[in-house]
């Protein structure tokens, strides 16, 4: 997310607060942080695959190797639709990586701007509990991609004789990725293997967040870097809630990280002031840079 996207998202945040009703705060966890027991290598690999979605599509072709993964397929132009790359990875299976906000695209920025909560899309609404709400802009962006993603997953799972599907995203791409991870678990044969999300904004209301926990909580891995402000929007009191168990890298871009159990854990990121720049949102995650359009192209897995 570049500076233009930052400004637009902040303005959208202000407008949403002024225009919309406030909701009672949902529960926030007070559990103490614990050591991260997940394997770190898949985070490192996943970060490189999502960084590559920010690179110019004309600069690489199918067959590109990134760590243990081979690039297979892409859709999206970063404008009308967010870019999505598919890879075949030894550690992750068929990996779906989704680009974050394109700061040079008004359409991409507007996905971040549309804060109003909506019902789940008709494609998957039957699987969601009554009362679940999803941020409109993120759902619009996902719905533009979902049919092509599902077709590609079926094709490459068959061709590669691969049962595992992993969803990866950064920033807006993490929000879209959370919807994709849920949808794949609910509607695709074989379901979801893992999801790795970096700099995740809030996507839905407490009913949605709790359904995420019940459905893919044991498969979801998501991380916040330093004083990144993006995971704090849409604001909690506007009715949005994160799923459980974020990993907080603090100080930002370091190798110091802890897992914060439960939803909206009060002992982690709420304890430090936000920094409204990209130094942490686009930074080093588990030894790999996610730098957006200003990052490393091709991505370098585990280079930091």
From Swiss-Prot:
It catalyses: a monoacylglycerol + H2O = glycerol + a fatty acid + H(+); a diacylglycerol + H2O = a monoacylglycerol + a fatty acid + H(+). Pfam families: Lipase_3. Residues 1-19 form the signal peptide. It is found in: Secreted; Secreted, Cell wall. Glycans are attached at residues 102, 161, 253. Disulfide bonds join 55-297. Keywords: Cell wall, Disulfide bond, Glycoprotein, Hydrolase, Lipid degradation, Lipid metabolism, Secreted, Signal, Virulence. It is an enzyme of class 3 (hydrolase). The keyword Disulfide bond applies. Coiled coil: none annotated. Its EC number is 3.1.1.-. InterPro entries: AB_hydrolase_fold, Fungal_lipase-type, Sec_MonoDiacylglyc_Lipase. Belongs to the AB hydrolase superfamily. Lipase family. Class 3 subfamily. This is Secreted mono- and diacylglycerol lipase MDL4. The gene is MDL4.
């Amino acid at each position: 997310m570049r500076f233009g996207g930052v400004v637009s998202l902040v303005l959208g945040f202000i407008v949403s607060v002024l225009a919309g009703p406030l909701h009672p705060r949902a529960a926030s966890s007070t559990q103490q942080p614990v050591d991260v027991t997940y394997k770190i290598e898949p985070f490192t690999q996943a970060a490189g695959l999502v960084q590559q979605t920010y690179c110019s599509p004309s600069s690489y072709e199918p067959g590109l190797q990134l760590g243990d993964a081979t690039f297979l397929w892409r859709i999206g132009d970063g404008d009308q639709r967010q870019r999505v790359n598919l890879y075949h990875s030894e550690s992750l299976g068929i990996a779906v990586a989704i680009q974050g906000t394109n700061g040079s695209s008004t359409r991409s920025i507007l996905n971040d701007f549309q804060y109003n909560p909506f019902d789940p899309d008709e494609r998957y609404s039957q699987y969601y509990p009554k009362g679940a709400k999803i941020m409109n802009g993120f759902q619009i962006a996902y719905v533009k991609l979902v049919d092509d993603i599902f077709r590609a997953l079926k094709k490459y799972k068959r061709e590669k004789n691969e049962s595992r599907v992993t969803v990866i995203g950064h920033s807006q791409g993490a929000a879209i990725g959370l919807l994709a991870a849920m949808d794949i678990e609910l509607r695709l044969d074989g379901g979801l293997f893992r999801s790795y999300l970096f700099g995740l904004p809030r996507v839905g209301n407490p009913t949605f967040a709790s359904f995420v926990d019940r459905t893919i909580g044991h498969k979801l891995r998501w991380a916040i870097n330093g004083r990144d402000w993006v995971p704090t929007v849409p604001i909690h009191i506007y009715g949005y809630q994160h799923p459980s168990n974020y990993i907080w890298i603090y100080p930002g871009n370091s190798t110091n990280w802890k897992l914060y159990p439960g939803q909206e854990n009060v002992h982690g990121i709420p304890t430090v002031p936000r920094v409204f720049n990209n130094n942490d949102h686009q930074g080093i995650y588990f030894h790999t840079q996610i730098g957006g359009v200003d990052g490393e192209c091709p991505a370098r897995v585990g280079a930091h």
